[in-house]
Amino acid sequence: MFSGPSGHAHTISYGGGIGLGTGGGGGSGGSGSGSQGGGGGIGIGGGGVAGLQDCDGYDFTKCENAARWRGLFTPSLKKVLEQVHPRVTAKEDALLYVEKLCLRLLAMLCAKPLPHSVQDVEEKVNKSFPAPIDQWALNEAKEVINSKKRKSVLPTEKVHTLLQKDVLQYKIDSSVSAFLVAVLEYISADILKMAGDYVIKIAHCEITKEDIEVVMNADRVLMDMLNQSEAHILPSPLSLPAQRASATYEETVKELIHDEKQYQRDLHMIIRVFREELVKIVSDPRELEPIFSNIMDIYEVTVTLLGSLEDVIEMSQEQSAPCVGSCFEELAEAEEFDVYKKYAYDVTSQASRDALNNLLSKPGASSLTTAGHGFRDAVKYYLPKLLLVPICHAFVYFDYIKHLKDLSSSQDDIESFEQVQGLLHPLHCDLEKVMASLSKERQVPVSGRVRRQLAIERTRELQMKVEHWEDKDVGQNCNEFIREDSLSKLGSGKRIWSERKVFLFDGLMVLCKANTKKQTPSAGATAYDYRLKEKYFMRRVDINDRPDSDDLKNSFELAPRMQPPIVLTAKNAQHKHDWMADLLMVITKSMLDRHLDSILQDIERKHPLRMPSPEIYKFAVPDSGDNIVLEERESAGVPMIKGATLCKLIERLTYHIYADPTFVRTFLTTYRYFCSPQQLLQLLVERFNIPDPSLVYQDTGTAGAGGMGGVGGDKEHKNSHREDWKRYRKEYVQPVQFRVLNVLRHWVDHHFYDFEKDPMLLEKLLNFLEHVNGKSMRKWVDSVLKIVQRKNEQEKSNKKIVYAYGHDPPPIEHHLSVPNDEITLLTLHPLELARQLTLLEFEMYKNVKPSELVGSPWTKKDKEVKSPNLLKIMKHTTNVTRWIEKSITEAENYEERLAIMQRAIEVMMVMLELNNFNGILSIVAAMGTASVYRLRWTFQGLPERYRKFLEECRELSDDHLKKYQERLRSINPPCVPFFGRYLTNILHLEEGNPDLLANTELINFSKRRKVAEIIGEIQQYQNQPYCLNEESTIRQFFEQLDPFNGLSDKQMSDYLYNESLRIEPRGCKTVPKFPRKWPHIPLKSPGIKPRRQNQTNSSSKLSNSTSSVAAAAAASSTATSIATASAPSLHASSIMDAPTAAAANAGSGTLAGEQSPQHNPHAFSVFAPVIIPERNTSSWSGTPQHTRTDQNNGEVSVPAPHLPKKPGAHVWANNNSTLASASAMDVVFSPALPEHLPPQSLPDSNPFASDTEAPPSPLPKLVVSPRHETGNRSPFHGRMQNSPTHSTASTVTLTGMSTSGGEEFCAGGFYFNSAHQGQPGAVPISPHVNVPMATNMEYRAVPPPLPPRRKERTESCADMAQKRQAPDAPTLPPRDGELSPPPIPPRLNHSTGISYLRQSHGKSKEFVGNSSLLLPNTSSIMIRRNSAIEKRAAATSQPNQAAAGPISTTLVTVSQAVATDEPLPLPISPAASSSTTTSPLTPAMSPMSPNIPSHPVESTSSSYAHQLRMRQQQQQQTHPAIYSQHHQHHATHLPHHPHQHHSNPTQSRSSPKEFFPIATSLEGTPKLPPKPSLSANFYNNPDKGTMFLYPSTNEE
């Protein structure tokens, strides 16, 4: 409806490329806001219609008048928008804004003199509207009033009434109103058309008021028409846009394409606008060759390059990066770029300038003025500068080639760019010579992006340099900076010239005068370089060329419409030429852009793209409601198909107008439901074979030949015919064939299983690809063939999985070795069981193909054929659920049943860490079955945290799996989602939506799109593998798992429910007692933490910092403590060996006779590492470290450190490298020793031990030997904390040492090292959370303490604390649990170690923890001990004091029963035996705390330390082989239980119910306290511990 003079719709272009891009546009990409996307200007002042009252006559802005007109046009404007942009909507404020613009125009047309006829309105339009929009608007209005069929959309009758009554106040003919309304409708349609184009370019679908302001600002024609006054220009802050540094290859390629499109438009401007207008005034077109040279050849090269770049981008949408080097290489090898050499020499020659001047001097040149306002001056001044654009763009190519070569990651791409650089080097040199020959004063055009960036920088500079600069001028007028120069201004009436500094922007020209009298500015004032003298808005300025005269040369005139003209003079002719070129470019660019758009649309109308007839090509059937239905306005981009026939789907899949990669993915995922693979390939081959243009245009050829006579007519017909064929091949054949190959590439790349199932399909595809011809197509055929070859090779060579982060899988965990047919939940390690289930289920999940889901084939008869992998995972999940259910119900014995249930929950705990939701919900389903859910007594016997965790897992499946979905969205892969949810959703979609649209035969593709969305979610979790090893025995067990072979579901359910009733009858008051089914299997769980952790030191810092200590230690074999077994109840010796300063033994956790595997630094690494850096010169290594003097394990990479889930959960590390033999290790750390094992089978000596005094060991040691009772294992064995229902006992050997340089402490598998000359220490280990190294980061001075796990103070705990005191000790006062006990003054030479250990291991319980001197239950003992030490020191001689050496070794042996008739001591749990009055360490409890114990202390800290050292030397003399130092407790933080001195080495013990120290054969050996009461139920209290605990990393 809205068309220009030729009947074609006209649009405005945005883009500010070299020369003619509009200032506000963001290029063809249509970028968003601000200076890049439309200037950020606000168009018409302030969002209102300011200025309407400036016109004489009716005031539309008065309240009473505005109320009559408000909302009159908005309903009709919606209809106008539907006509120009059917798929775009507009907000109400945008429509009101357009309405106000229309009212402003109406006020202009109805101003005095008042119009009485149509001719009066025409005159006003000619005067008010700038060219060429005045003629287009008048033609549109005349067509409306002259046509009986066409009527205006705007309400003509209402406007006619208001005009007569209110505006004009006299009667007018209805034709006048109709004419006015038609003009308004044309202008409103033009505005809405431009706004719609703009929002589509920025990927929006709704027009806002701001969008209209942007496009109004970008169009000078409309701004001229509305003639906005300066007073109503509102300031718009110009913010610096995001810097696009093009750091990536992809972004650079996109920028190249953007620049290439703008360059193509500049070439169109040269060819279509200037060249074709000049052809009209010459007799022979060859006269223009000196001016334009071979510009057509350059245009062809540009089109070819741009097409190749776009093809590469489309083909590589799902690849890592597009490789565009081949695009340049093909053109360079064909010497296509050489056209720039000829062009550069021709255009810059004097002959070219002379030819243009001669042309303009011809009489016919006067007709150029009719081409548009200022066109003749544009030809004279602007065209020569525009002709330099192709030369400058050649240098843009050189820059892009160099930049892309540097960014490319493909070796082939880099080689292509290197080849191109070599081929184009001669051209580069030639063009540099040409540019050097140009006059230095002749300015070279720059790109629009550079001009926009310069505008931002210069406006900020002018704010600082120019006095009286106003920010309000910036917003819509300073989007591009054109130039900065000096001109002379002629004074008014006098021949006085004044120098002006001129700044030219796309919408503003500022003339400034230099500040010659610079004064020292006052405080806070700014010193300006210039003063603002004049400013002109370029849309209201005309430029008039002034011929040279004797008085005035090189001058031109600026003629503002509202101000008197001024004359400016340039330095010389070339200077004037450049200024005129820039000024005319700014003024005429909007008019030239509109003219170019009209020409391009006219070309399309003259040479329409014709489609083949449906008879010869079935994919050319026109769209209709019978073959395709589109979605309702889903987006402003590519239309979405709701339903279509199969041929229409194939047509849109390979559409010639646009590419839709989302539709390609959706179609290839879901097509199998309505089309077979064979049928799809056949349709794609038919789609590729497009009819020849001779068959399409044969009717036009005969008609044209008969309708034209003469040679000229035949030549014109041939040219037109050639253009038709050319457009057909370029715009239809090539895009369709290219997109067919793209679909084939996607098919073989992402759905190759179709070809694996059907070899004939693959053979047919290869046969088709062999016969594809054409150089451009062969390149893409080769890419498809490469993918096919790669897929075939992958099938033949089972590629090894490369795990994320480069980690190795953790080693296999074993619990009990039993035959395969005796595997149960109790025999498998819960950690490894969960790992293997997760690994198996992920592989099953990964193998499910989209073809197994589309159309719900798993519910059909042939499901075994169509959905084999899906049925496999469904069957496996059901079997696991049945197996858990059967294992629980068949366990008659209550303790076994409870252990099995606990073991199943532990498996779920690990699965939650591994994100195996499918496995978790399968076990939850087993717990929720009728036969298990009713076992009330069994569930009540579970520990509290187990019950709580089970409830949390059950909540995952509540409320339609709401919490599960939230959790799934929050985790990072790898994971195993619950497949049942996907199947349910797909089934609901399949059954709830018809396959065909209602009352049609069209495929319901919206249904397929929804299914594809679900399948896409499934696929996104299939690509990240687990870093786990496969254990063949467990894998085979679960692959063959069939708990009820051959039974029906009803038979299984009945059997399980009957078993459940038998083991727990209805209403039973107590649990029935049954004998144990597996009496030989220990019921205690090994926990869910790995029980072996090798120790290695891969830090390079350790080798130098500990060389002296290691060398001294390696020179001797070391002292060990051997707790001999003198009673039948003791079967093991605790053997400790420490060869180096960096090694300390911990339990291996292996079964008897089993060798631990080679160390793996990432043994427990499953997920991404977490960094724990150095703190205060102490670095924590990833694993407990050791240095071997006999061999190197070959590990050189820095291992990923680990953190424990709970404080006190001691992880034992495999340390066979430091033991005398593997058998010794097996004995010391076996989880349970059989009762029949004779003592002789155990080693009772250490080959490294000697009778002589051993050199000091640099590290304290802790060796744990579990008791022989079956099922009672020490918590030190590296598993989850023991349940209070299981007692534990162990033999503990502590070997301590003190050095002047630093201390290292080991307890329960944790190694705490204060830095010894930079030596890195160790950190606790977690099996599932990796902690990578970052030793160069600085943190607080000391590591933070672990989170406290303080127990509630109860009466029994208080009594136990009192029992620990000496018999004559005073009664302990009650203490508040939150108060910190007063510290003992520190030993200066051990302050570093004490400070370190206090904060790094504040919760290490009985064996590792706070200094015993910091605890109230030991402080009084230490006071009395001090006096005893003083007396002994005075009575003991010191003959060997000097020979003792600076290093001493403390050995503390806590042995189990020595005599056969003595009862065993109470078991001690390190996690449950801490003092009941211990409060968490706070920063105030530093070693230098001034708090002093309330009991008197006679000696100062320094004298006290001296006495301790004296006593140490005496002990060394008394016991040269094995000696003890009690004062080492507060120096190295040994266990804080009190010790008493006894001279009688054979003192007997009392009943274990009361606490008496354990005696040894050595005087002064510390005594082991009793196990405290477990009534606090620490582990089962959810407030005290969580399911997976992690150490705190924050300061308490």
Curated annotation (Swiss-Prot):
Q: Where is the composition biased (Basic and acidic residues)?
A: 1352-1366
Where does the record place the DH domain?
A: 248-434
Question: Spans of biased composition, class Basic residues?
Answer: 1526-1542
Domain PH span(s) in chain numbering: 480-588
Q: Which GO terms describe its cellular component?
A: cytosol; extrinsic component of cytoplasmic side of plasma membrane; plasma membrane; rhabdomere microvillus membrane
User: Ranges of Polar residues compositional bias?
Assistant: 1175-1195, 1280-1291
The Phosphoserine modification is found at: 1550-1551
| An annotated GO BP | positive regulation of Ras protein signal transduction
Q: Which residues form the N-terminal Ras-GEF domain?
A: 637-792
Record keyword Phosphoprotein present? yes
**Low complexity composition-biased segments:** 1096-1105, 1469-1489
Per the database record, which ranges form the Ras-GEF domain?
Answer: 829-1066
Q: What does this protein do?
A: Promotes the exchange of Ras-bound GDP by GTP. Functions in signaling pathways initiated by the sevenless and epidermal growth factor receptor tyrosine kinases; implies a role for the ras pathway in neuronal development.
> What is the name of the protein in this document?
Protein son of sevenless
